[in-house]
């Protein structure tokens, strides 16, 4: 009797802890959403009047800048304009608004109707227990709107939005296999007693078929499936490395397959990966996902740990469970190929996936699986070459620059923040970075400084770089303890290659010396396993 009572008390304590953890997560999420809103509003504020006038007249065409921007920059611009539209619309609002929309005294007569910027809503996709999905047009561009049904899914929607703006959108800048989150808005709906505010999530529209549909209709060969899976591993590795991201709901309905005609490149570990496939997978629906923006803080689901879904990163979960889902709906050929892929995990039983994950399977990172595939399947439609890019988004236009281009002020320049720290601010690397971002280096202003100025900047960089050369010659036993410093040196290597300053002798000598060092060789071999240990903490 006492044992049963003790067990019941323990269960209640566990429930209470999960409830408290969920509340803490929501408070943290709301704070981060408010931070994002403040940042967006500060960028938009100078252009509010122009935004209202252009929308009222039907003159705001996002296509105006579409050809001048990368796809990722264009999506970022859309998200800022979307927030601006919410601010100037009385019948809707957003979560954690920074101001009461816009100052009503200033714009008393100038609020716009929502149907001026969000139109043609229609039901879209398959029926879902979680809620309804709609397709609509935001200023002429297709978007997806998700409306949750119950309180649990309302919590999921907030987490989906948080993961989107704080994690996924940043990953989308580096890798096209994530769907961009544009915004969240409240829509007032009448009920029997009172009007209720529903929270709707708005995301990028991905044009393609679900992986489930393609597998069921036998539209993929095993090689094409393998190319798709390898791309998903690349995306998951980028997500885990940057934000300890775990999708936790990566079934075949949550992967959209997009036909592509052009190659694209991603950057993982020490590789530039040139992808040359017919199909690109895009992962959607991040309400169940876990992510970590700050050390020792992880946001995720607290209520379904019995199903193997945790509020923190479980490195091997997504690839393994994804393959199980695919095997269930595949034809004989692909099913046989998936069984062969399972050899990566060794001789294990795949029936009870939760217990299997708790063993060796859950400890395997996407990068380790990807390297296994590279060795085992030479027919993979990817080229792996030495890495030359630190981060794609480094050279993208800022939202402020894009807003200035859109609203009447094309000459505004935006100062960029430091790449690493203040030690680089006065050097040639930082100068090149700022020139490239502001498109100054390629025109008539190329020789804007004197030779003595260039020499002074290069000298400043060399003093900073010399610290890392001395680090190279340290004892081998210290390398694992100084992995953060080593990662900084590797990032500098990729940055200098990205800025194409190899032709400058001082930088070329540093690059050659660093790449030839035993320490860099050690990094390439050991970093994946160090990452695995850190992700399992």
From Swiss-Prot:
Keyword presence, Nucleotide-binding: yes
SUPFAM superfamilies for this protein: Protein kinase-like (PK-like) (SSF56112)
InterPro entries tied to this protein: Kinase-like_dom_sf, Prot_kinase_dom
EC number(s) per entry: 2.7.-.-
Keywords per UniProt: ATP-binding, Coiled coil, Kinase, Nucleotide-binding, Transferase
Pfam families tied to this protein: Haspin_kinase
Binding positions for ATP per the UniProt entry: 125-133, 146
Residues the record marks as active site: 249 (proton acceptor)
GO biological process terms, semicolon-separated: intracellular signal transduction
Domain Protein kinase: 119-429
GO MF assignments: ATP binding; histone H3T3 kinase activity
UniProt keyword tRNA-binding, yes or no: no
Domain of life: Viruses
Coiled coil: 1-74
PANTHER family linked: INTERLEUKIN-1 RECEPTOR-ASSOCIATED KINASE, SERINE_THREONINE-PROTEIN KINASE HASPIN
Protein family (similarity comment): Belongs to the protein kinase superfamily.
Function: Probable kinase.
Record-given protein name: Probable kinase 439L
Organism of provenance: Invertebrate iridescent virus 6
